[in-house]
Amino acid sequence: MRTVVWQSLSEEQQDAILERPAIAEGANITAAVADVIAKVRTQGDAALLELTEKFDRVKPESIRVPSKEINAASERLSAEMKQALEQAYSNIAKFHKAQKPQPIKVETQPGVMCEQVTRPIQKVGLYIPGGSAPLPSTVLMLGVPAKIAGCRKVVLCSPPPIADEILYVAKLCGIDEVYNVGGGQAVAAMAYGTKSVSKVDKIFGPGNAYVTEAKRQVSNDFRGAAIDMPAGPSEVLVIADETADPDFIAADLLSQAEHGPDSQVVLVTPSPIVADQVTDAVQRQLKALSRADIAQKALASSLIIISESITQAVSISNYYGPEHLIVQTKNPRELLPLLDNAGSIFLGDWSPESAGDYASGTNHVLPTYGYTRTYSSLGLADFSKRMTVQELSAEGLQNLAPTVVTMAEAEGLDAHKRAVTIRVEKLTQNR
């Protein structure tokens, strides 16, 4: 990790120092994904089976996972694992149930009633990556709010063979259908539908560059599907003062660095002593990690920033807008009102990022790569949509008519004006 003194940098250097590592996109990925999507749209299930065998080197017996296979997953898991998953489920459900929106009903003037109502998105698709380690936590983070929101159909795609933990949590969440499909072909199948895979209205979940590009492409097609949010590499920023525990900070930085070589970790502190202690602790703890080589690559593009004060550290954090923000200071809650841009915030020594990643109850699907300035952490609202309602009485329309007519005339929209005056004339005739 590189250490820099913030005040010694010019404004241009400060901007440059906080730039994220570039995301490798490339025309080859764009073209390859477009080909996969086109193949799935034209060949349907046959394309899914062919691409699964090609990319995953597996030939599933069926695209949809049978119920008996999902039920059998429970028998192969330890009691300890099931208890952990159920505890996480309980906490995540509690927090997301509390997010249920309340209807709004306001009489803006006599006889003019305005309302806001919320309805669930009818059909949603969840993408769960494969790889060397299963991600049942992501199933929880997507499946729990989808069901609480009331989505009528919730389906899940994951590359085969699907881990027992994922199948168990899918059943725990009440997910309707699980498919043995991964990669960009899974995104295409959910966006456009095949004989076996249900078409959905919105797709959620992380993935590699091909999955991310597939989500982008289908979301740009009105016949495709909406997506949750733009994706980018994982990141964490820690604000720490002289009271912070350097071993805790190092552990938090490394827990993010081990996600991938493109992850970025940043420490901002006014204490050079803490900075040095954290540097030593990172090197010491790194040796014990099974993914040390991955974490080491991430650390190469990571930073320790020496700020003038905690106030300046907050400003740096707000400018950077991290996915995860950890505050290890004497009075961390006092800083909360000053923090504007972050996906999820972890206050105090006893709030490691890992808690939020798995089981505290908050959602771990978060905006990254600076999108925290405009995007929120995933929640119940992402699985719903709002509608407004207005109901005017005869008296209400008469009272509002002069305002609407004047504005319609100013905009040159005669039919808008007439839709009001024709009603007012009718009311006048009926008196």
From Swiss-Prot:
- Molecular function, one GO term: histidinol dehydrogenase activity
* Residues binding Zn(2+): 256, 259, 357, 416
Pathway info: Amino-acid biosynthesis; L-histidine biosynthesis; L-histidine from 5-phospho-alpha-D-ribose 1-diphosphate: step 9/9
Which cofactors are named for this entry?
Zn(2+)
Q: What is this protein called?
A: Histidinol dehydrogenase
Query: Which positions does UniProt annotate for substrate binding?
Result: 234, 256, 259, 324, 357, 411, 416
| Classification via Pfam families | Histidinol_dh
Keywords linked to the UniProt accession:
Amino-acid biosynthesis, Histidine biosynthesis, Metal-binding, NAD, Oxidoreductase, Zinc
Q: Which family does it belong to?
A: Belongs to the histidinol dehydrogenase family.
**Function description:** Catalyzes the sequential NAD-dependent oxidations of L-histidinol to L-histidinaldehyde and then to L-histidine.
Reaction equations catalysed: L-histidinol + 2 NAD(+) + H2O = L-histidine + 2 NADH + 3 H(+)
Task: List the EC numbers from the record.
Answer: 1.1.1.23
Q: How is the cofactor bound?
A: Binds 1 zinc ion per subunit.
PANTHER family named among the record's database cross-references: HISTIDINE BIOSYNTHESIS TRIFUNCTIONAL PROTEIN (PTHR21256:SF2), HISTIDINOL DEHYDROGENASE HDH (PTHR21256)
Domain of life, source organism: Bacteria
Per its UniProt record, what NCBIfam families does this chain match? hisD (TIGR00069)
Give the residues annotated as active site.
323-324
Q: List ligand-binding residues for NAD(+).
A: 127, 185, 208
Q: Example GO biological process term?
A: L-histidine biosynthetic process
Q: Name one GO cellular component term.
A: cytosol
Asked if the record carries the keyword tRNA processing, the reply is no
